[in-house]
Amino acid sequence: VRKLFSVTLLAASMLASVTAAQEAPKADAASLEELKAQIKVMQEQLKSLEAKTAAPAAKPAAAPVPATQIKWEGSPRFTDASGATFKLRGRVLIDGVNVDVNRDTGPSYKSRQYRARQVFLGAEGQFGAFAYRIEGGAANGGAWGWDDAVIEYKTKSGLLLTVGNQKVGGLENLTSIKAITFMERGPFGDLTDNGFVLAAQATKVGKNWSLRGALQGDSINKADVSSGAYIANNAKERSGFMVRGTYAPIMTADDAVHLGVSARYRDTGGETGFTYSAAANTAYKPQTSTGGVLLSTGAVGKSDTSIAAEAAWKHKTVSVQGELAQIKVNRVATTQSAANGGKDFNIVTGYALASWFPTGESRPYNAAGQFGKVKILNPIDKGGMGAFELAGRYDYADLTKMSPNAVTALASQPGLATAGTYKGLTAGVNWYPYSNVRFMANVTKAKVNNRRIGTIENDADVTVFQARMQIEF
């Protein structure tokens, strides 16, 4: 602009000179022509500068997009230019457990333990249509082992194919230990053996329904079968399959109704028979070292078929859920094991729970037939008090249909003395200062009724107090 002003001023001055020259005597015609030529040049420059001034200024160039983007999701998730992702994950669960067992006959006992329920570390990521998830650590003071160790592929039609160490199925089991309402899943989870197994699974999730099926083996943490338990040359690992279907006739942010069914078949192959045992809402099982086992059949199952039904309802801050399963046990032959063999029988187990958030939170439900992690409305870093959850659960199990065989004495069939019934009530309170931090307290009162074998009747009244501090990312 300053340059334009200078040129304009110069041009005006030269025009004034021309006018003065025209009024003067025409003494020097050559000088006048030269002056006119200079004025013409100046006019062209003036037009050029005016055009440049009128043109809009060019926009500054956009900042280049970083090659790798970082998003905070409890821990950083890295995404590169191709869309590939990587994220660390982990959890630490520290428990204090107090167990008090009073028995009618046999020794009563008390036990207390402070323990790392889980210390796990892992990672997850994605490469195009392929994804992976791997997580392992130490549980219950044991050696390192793997939970999730899977590779996933999602087709264009939305079918999810998963291969690796993964959960078996069921409403409560598919809900992560980081998000379940109580510290443990109780006898239902113990008896249905809903752990992690190597499997090839296909899952399809619709708007409000899901369907999954899997071919299953044993846990990735178990060593290869080198010889058979009953026939040395029959070194086959256990195997089976599972199907589960769910439907939610109501599914909104505030309300949900969940219905589900599942079926599972397992065969031991050449391994030792399946054992069906349970503890009173705790992963800490002092029964194995003091006072004997409270509820167990022993290794009696050659194969089994489980049929289960699921239901859940939630309305805003309140939710109710339950599962009921029947396990048809095909027992090992008495020719293979006189102690464990006998007639086939059925086990029935189930639970019902209720949960309430007085602070206004709601358990999130999704179309895959699962409950997820609770979102805290007023975390303490925002000046709030976090979230509180109050809950109660009733557990039931009946193993009494297991009958004795006529091959050996009753005292030589150890599972008979502990194949009884379990009835228990658990109350819990949870505090969530943040979405990824939780403090839990549970108290369980349970009654185990077992049959009398000779002079021994292993009935027991069990009281468990336990607390947990949990952080996950």
Placement of each model-derived feature along the sequence:
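Gram-negative bacterial Sec-dependent N-terminal signal peptides
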Residues: 1-22
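A general secondary-structure boundary signal
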Residues: 31-42, 53-54, 120-124, 148-150, ...
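Outer membrane beta-barrel
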Residues: 69, 73-269, 346-382, 387-405
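Outer-membrane beta-barrel pore domains
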Residues: 26, 273-473
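N-terminal periplasmic/intermembrane-space "pro-region" immediately following the signal or transit peptide
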Residues: 20-93, 100, 362-376, 408, ...
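Structural signature of transmembrane alpha-helix termini at the membrane-water interface
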Residues: 15-18, 249, 447, 473
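Short, solvent-exposed secondary-structure boundary motifs
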Residues: 67-69, 112, 300-301, 444
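Hydrophobic alpha-helical membrane context
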Residues: 14-15, 130, 454
